Design a protein with these regions (language model features):
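N-terminal Rossmann-like dinucleotide-binding module
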Residues: 1-49
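Beta-loop-alpha module in the N-terminal Rossmann-like domain of NAD(P)-dependent dehydrogenases
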Residues: 52-96
Length: 96
């Protein structure tokens, strides 16, 4: 039975690379489930690199995935709304 923390990363900008490398480094305890970003070109690159599901809509991702943790690597101006949405879905959150 796999008992890893299931993670989604939201936002594929510069800071997300630090989180992706940490997830890879601790692959025995963490599992990247999906990635969300509004930029479809970035999503395509990330899908090829990490071979996980991708979403362009946070709400859709939260409805469709069973996650333990969401890492928000998005612009600070939208953190509050995204944090509340994740909390309403019962997901733990790291806000960059």
């Amino acid at each position: 039975m796999e008992n890893k923390i299931k993670i989604a990363v939201v936002g594929c900008g510069h800071i997300s690379s630090k989180h992706f490398s940490s997830i890879e480094k601790h692959h025995n305890k963490l599992k990247l489930i999906c990635i969300c970003d509004s930029n479809k070109d970035k999503l395509l690159l990330m899908k090829k690199k990490f071979k996980v599901k991708t979403y362009s809509n946070l709400n859709e991702m939260l409805k469709n995935e069973k996650l333990d943790l969401v890492v928000l690597c998005t612009p600070s101006g939208i953190h509050a709304d995204q944090t509340v949405l994740c909390a309403k879905h019962g997901v733990n959150i790291i806000v960059e």
